[in-house]
């Protein structure tokens, strides 16, 4: 609330617990069989788009350029995106992505606010870094500024939220962006049996597009 008051006039709008109540009526208004598209798929696509700072006017061209297949045709989704934003504004609500976008805009447009925010936090630690999306990464970098006081923890083989825009590339490319960083490998496994880890290691060795060298080590007896 403090940060919002420094960036916007008026009180902080209420956050949406879920996009479903706003998306349900919009889903049912889609033509033909598209009205049966799962609301969750529509919500995931909204989060994917917002993670790339797309808006209804830029969405369709972006997905076509990327060769992405949305849950409904791009023109239909762009219209749904626009109606969702209007419904959200009428309800006086914001979603989680709106909060991140507003914070990032504050860093980008208000030097005084950026310096104030940066001064309140010196060290940053990010868990599950493999599930970071472009919007979150941009906000993290803006909050850091010129500092390098950052620790991240993640596993590129446990990336889950790619459907909403996350990518493990920020984790796997961390040492390139921060060449002075110290890498600590957490390979001792205290949960699984050696048999399970042997199978996991065989599968991981075949994972395409991932840096190798990881080998999980069992600490439990067979």
Identify the function of each model-found stretch.
Residues 6, 143, 177:
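Conserved catalytic core of Hanks-type protein kinase domains
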Residues 48-75, 79, 217:
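A contiguous, low-structure linker/loop signature
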Residues 50-59, 93, 148, 204-216:
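Proline-centered turn/helix-capping motifs that create local helix->coil transitions or kinks
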Residues 9-12, 158-220:
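Conserved coupling/interface region of RecA-like P-loop/ASCE motor cores
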Residues 1-58, 172, 216:
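Conserved P-loop NTPase-based nucleic-acid remodeling module centered on helicase motor cores
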Residues 6-10, 26-33, 49, 66, ...:
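Alpha-helix C-capping/helix-to-loop hinge sites
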Residues 46, 68-173, 185-195:
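Conserved helicase NTPase motor core
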Residues 29, 34-39, 67, 74, ...:
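Hydrophobic/basic alpha-helical segments enriched in Actinobacteria
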